[in-house]
From Swiss-Prot:
InterPro entries: SLC35_F1/F2/F6 (IPR009262), SLC35F_Transporter (IPR052221). It is a multi-pass membrane protein. It is found in: Cytoplasmic vesicle, Secretory vesicle, Synaptic vesicle membrane. Belongs to the SLC35F solute transporter family. Pfam families: SLC35F. This is Solute carrier family 35 member F1. Its main location: membrane. Keywords: Cytoplasmic vesicle, Membrane, Synapse, Transmembrane, Transmembrane helix, Transport. GO terms for molecular function: transmembrane transporter activity. Residues 1-20 are annotated as: Disordered.
């Protein structure tokens, strides 16, 4: 008898393949008991040092320093003007501007005249003469209105209302240059203006000379008009030096600025010029003023191209403080600790503003990084997908390609 075969084991169907796991699991090593506090504190200190080093990088510090060079030049302009007006009774703001425009004409306009091709002076005039004519007139009248305002209103009013140039530059940059700001930029701007307010408060407390203030409304309107024209001029300058060239801007400003200031000098200031008691001291002051003004005009496009018109105007807020510190020795001003507080508050605001980059909006979904002091810009290929530097968890298959985004 043949024994029955043992029952064959039933074959189980293979299990279905597991669905793809799109959840990224991160395992962190926990510190050993007893050493956690030391590890965490050391890690937090290292992280804080890295953040500070990232903010206070070389590019940002250079940008702030360049802005302070401009501020020192403005301080030199103010000091020489004060000596001319108060010690020698030479109230000649148009003549002083005329000297600067003549220097720009001799250096930069003649450079354009000897160039060949499309960058020649005549070629530029054929294409854009009316734009530079308007810009030259705006630049001249901006200088004239602010200087003229000192005859009607107080020093405090001029200092406060001159800050109006900052919102003008921001709005014009937003609409015409398409520059987009982050929250930290607005925080930095507010801190800078608070520092300026602290300086004005110190002026009032120590009783610093405020001027006659005979017709404050007229003076205040002159300051607001001058600040508005300054803002238009600065934003237009930024547009020109980014799309064309610094030499073209300065050459055309020298040409039309000298033309219009010469006409205004002949009409409005020729009698004042004849009253000036000329001697070597007055001549030296005019030379010093012209050197500072020429240096400011020549160097400002370099700083604007590296940073922005907004950053430059924030940097110039410290010019009054430099003038005041010089006045402690030259004019025996009274000192207040609020001046130092104001100075460092403005510098903190500048560091905050310069700590991150602004953007130029070229498309609602695509932003191109603007060259600002936080660091060098690296151009990425347009075909490569850029992943933002954040940690995220994907819970499903992506079915649509995301737009390319530059993340600061």
């Amino acid at each position: 008898m043949i024994p029955p075969e043992p029952p064959q084991p039933q074959l189980q169907p293979p299990p279905p393949p597991a669905p793809p796991n799109h959840v990224v699991t991160t395992i962190e090593n926990l510190p050993a008991e007893g050493s956690g506090g030391v590890s965490l504190s050391a890690s937090s200190r290292a992280s804080m040092r890295q953040r500070i080093r990232k903010v206070l990088n070389r590019e940002m510090l250079i940008s702030v320093a360049l802005g302070q060079v401009l501020s020192l030049l403005v301080c030199g302009i103010g000091l020489t003007s004060k000596y001319l007006a108060e010690d020698f009774h030479a109230n000649t703001p148009v003549f002083q501007s005329f000297l600067n425009y003549i220097l720009l004409f001799l250096v930069y306009t003649t450079t354009l005249a000897v160039r060949q091709g499309e960058e020649n002076l005549l070629a530029i005039l054929r294409r854009r003469w009316w734009k530079y004519m308007i810009l030259g007139l705006i630049d001249l009248e901006a200088n004239y209105l602010v200087v003229k305002a000192y005859q009607y209103t107080t020093l405090t009013s001029v200092q406060l209302l001159d800050c109006f140039v900052i919102p003008v530059v921001i709005l014009l940059s937003w609409f015409f240059l398409l520059i987009r700001y982050k929250a930290v930029h607005f925080i930095g701007i507010v801190v800078c203006i608070l520092g300026m307010g602290c300086m004005v408060g110190a002026d009032v407390l120590v009783g610093r000379h405020q001027g006659a203030g005979e017709n404050k409304l007229v003076g205040d309107l002159l300051v607001l008009g001058g600040a508005t024209l300054y803002g238009i001029s600065n934003v237009w300058e930024e547009s020109i030096i980014r799309t064309l060239s610094r030499v073209e801007f300065l050459g055309m400003i020298g040409l039309f600025g000298a033309f219009f200031s010469g006409i205004q000098l002949a009409i409005m200031e020729h009698k004042e010029l004849l009253k000036v008691p000329w001697d070597w001291q007055i001549g030296l002051l005019y030379v010093g003023f012209s050197a500072c003004m020429f240096g400011l005009y020549s160097f400002m496009p370099v700083v604007i191209k590296k940073t922005s018109a907004t950053s430059v105007n924030l940097s110039l807020l410290t010019a009054d403080l430099y003038s005041l510190f010089c006045g402690l020795f030259l004019f025996h001003y009274k000192f207040s600790g609020l001046y130092l507080l104001s100075f460092f508050t403005i510098l903190i605001g500048l560091v905050l503003y310069s700590s991150t980059s602004t953007y130029i909006a070229q498309d609602p979904r695509v932003y191109k990084q603007f060259r600002n002091p936080s660091g060098p810009v690296v151009d990425l290929p347009s075909t490569a997908q850029v992943e933002p530097s954040v940690t995220y968890t994907s819970l499903g298959q992506e079915t649509e390609e995301e737009p390319h985004v530059r993340v600061a």
